[in-house]
Regions:
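Intrinsically disordered, low-complexity segments enriched in polar/charged small residues
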Residues: 8-12, 100-102
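Bacterial N-terminal signal peptides
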Residues: 3-5, 12-27
Length: 177
């Protein structure tokens, strides 16, 4: 009798063998990774943004008077257009305004005010490629940035640059739902 009871405690049940095997197999197999999907501004959308800026305030007759930069969700240039009368620095200014707006998810003029003087955020101005000038506007789908647009050289300075950039984003507003 003692032999039987010893044998019954040593021989595991079929259910416990299966459970143990499944546990080891699951622990040994790598987790199933899923691709990370992120929305981004398309080339067609970037073109439409540029066309929206040009239609709103970018032309003086047949000349393009503003410089426009559209960046993607990573802040990389997607489309850039230098105005016919642009100064050499305008292209870089437009790109940096777009980058600043995209990075901080707010118009660059608003960001400039938030980081001015003795603000606790003033150190952000030391980051590479940001610029505390108006003319950059983020391109958002809800709370998710998919890009930014920056304008430089509009008649009326930075507030006009920002208004032009907003007109560019408005040109694709129906696609940002």
């Amino acid at each position: 009798m003692s032999r039987l009871s010893f044998r019954s405690t040593v021989v595991p049940s079929l259910a416990s063998v299966i459970l143990t095997t499944v546990t080891f197999v699951m622990a040994a197999s790598p987790a199933q990774a899923q691709a990370l999907l992120q929305r981004n501004i398309s080339a067609a959308q970037a073109m439409a943004v540029v066309e929206g800026v040009l239609a709103s305030c970018g032309r003086d007759g047949t000349r393009v008077i503003v410089t426009i930069a559209v960046v993607d969700r990573a802040g990389q240039p997607r489309l850039m257009l230098a105005g016919d009368t642009a100064s050499p620095h305008n292209l870089d200014l437009a790109r940096r305004k777009a980058y600043t707006a995209r990075t901080f998810r707010r118009p660059s003029l608003e960001w400039a005010a938030r980081t001015a003087g003795d603000s606790p955020r003033a150190g952000q101005r030391q980051l590479t490629d940001v610029i505390p000038l108006g003319g950059g506007v983020p391109i958002m789908i809800g709370d998710e940035p998919i890009g930014g647009v920056g304008v430089s050289g509009a008649v009326g300075g930075q507030p006009a640059d920002e208004a032009c950039a907003m007109a560019g984003v408005a040109a694709i507003a129906d696609q940002l739902q």
